[in-house]
Amino acid sequence: MSHIRSRFSKPADELVVRYTTSLPFDWRLYQEDIKCSTAHARMLGKQSIISAGDSQSIINGLSDILTEIETGSFVFKPEMEDIHMAIEGRLFELIGEAAGRLHTARSRNDQVATDVHLFVKNTCTSTINKIRTLQGALLKQAEAHQQTALPGYTHLQVAQPVLLSHHLLAYFEMLERDCGRFTDAKKRSDVMPLGSGALAGVPYPLDRKMVAEELGFTAISQNSLDAVSERDFVLEYLSDAAICQMHLSRLSEEMVIWSSAEYAFVELDDAYTTGSSIMPQKKNPDVAELCRGKTGRVYGSLNTMLTVMKGLPLSYNRDLQEDKEPLFECADTLGDSLEVFAGMIKTATFKPERMLRALEKGYVLATDIADYLVGKGESFRSSHGIVARLVSYAISQNKTFGELSLEEYRQFSNLFGNDIYAVDIKSALNARNLTGGTAPKQIAQAIARAKKILAEAGVKN
């Protein structure tokens, strides 16, 4: 019987053991747990809370356990309810009774909280790195397509001409905000709960700062009740992940649409597409579709954790065991999505000629023609109505703006002159020459800014 059940007269029911164990999933915290235990043991020895000999024996034993786990020789025993007890149990086997001194001045409550803080902190770092890689892929494509124009859309209807670079850099900006959010989340996870005990602190002269420094934390928790029971930092990571995955889902939707035969704006590389079991001609954008579908998993992780936390009184409750599966699944899903998307964007082939064809038949210059009339002295509202009627006429005649005669233009306003034919895609793009606009000069500046952002982040592009 586990020493934790020494107060009870009989062992836990077998079903209860299976129901309450977390080892099948929290084994992933073994690195964080061993790192925390090593720092704790070292501090206990330094503070003479345990002997220097026991401290060193514990540290050596933990090092051996880490090697066993990473080489696959460690035996995960099902009777051990979590990774923390599995490691401690093996430590007893390796060094004997000295292992019992490791848990001095520590509870699993602050132990687990510290492990999860470390995991989230490290995951924020890896997530940011993966976002940077995807940003680099988007930037490369944007650089290559500074002269490629396509329709910009509202309501998925052709609206105004934009440069493909401008479109791709929109996602760069979304991802840049994601990096900022994960950087903030990392700050909130960079707080060490260890030393809080079960809930009220511990009656030992701990050197919490020493442990924090060894573990790489820049701050220690200030309230033991809060420290063992808060999971705000997990919620913040999950919330940030949901927003980031949503951005990927939006890009997924566009890759699905743009790669269809009706659009054919992009061809996805064979390595990132699949075929059909019955239709030989198919080249399906499954990676983009799955990324879009997996967004629900990430949202689900956030909703799960919010629900876990919503009714918990201070301080620790076993409900908090339910923080790990949604956290792990979310981290895996987002991490994989970012990695696969970086490869898919890097290898995608965009089709400028198809985009140009779409521009030619969408009346994308309607706003520019209205602006032309404004330049001639007409109010914009009046110009809007004139051009709306002009568009209806052009559609009825099955003509583009460029195919209308000057006489036809002048049926709608005498302000139209021969210079109306100077209003074209190039002039429309050049006219948006202000910060944030799609003009080529602005795109060049935006690309330079994006390069600077990545360079300052240490990303080679």
Swiss-Prot record:
BP GO terms, sorted: arginine biosynthetic process via ornithine; L-arginine biosynthetic process
Keyword Transmembrane belongs to the record: no
Q: Name one Pfam family in it.
A: ASL_C2
Q: Which GO terms describe its cellular component?
A: cytosol
Q: Where's it mainly located?
A: cytoplasm
Q: Where in the cell is it found?
A: Cytoplasm
Q: Does the keyword Plastid apply?
A: no
Biological or metabolic pathway of the protein: Amino-acid biosynthesis; L-arginine biosynthesis; L-arginine from L-ornithine and carbamoyl phosphate: step 3/3
Q: What is its EC number?
A: 4.3.2.1
GO molecular function (one):
argininosuccinate lyase activity
Catalytic activity reported: 2-(N(omega)-L-arginino)succinate = fumarate + L-arginine
The enzyme's first-digit EC class, named in words, is lyase
Q: Which InterPro entries match?
A: Arg_succ_lyase_C, Argininosuccinate_lyase, Fumarase/histidase_N, Fumarate_lyase_CS, Fumarate_lyase_fam, Fumarate_lyase_N, L-Aspartase-like
Q: Give the family per the record.
A: Belongs to the lyase 1 family. Argininosuccinate lyase subfamily.
HAMAP family attached to this UniProt entry: Arg_succ_lyase (MF_00006)
This protein is called: Argininosuccinate lyase
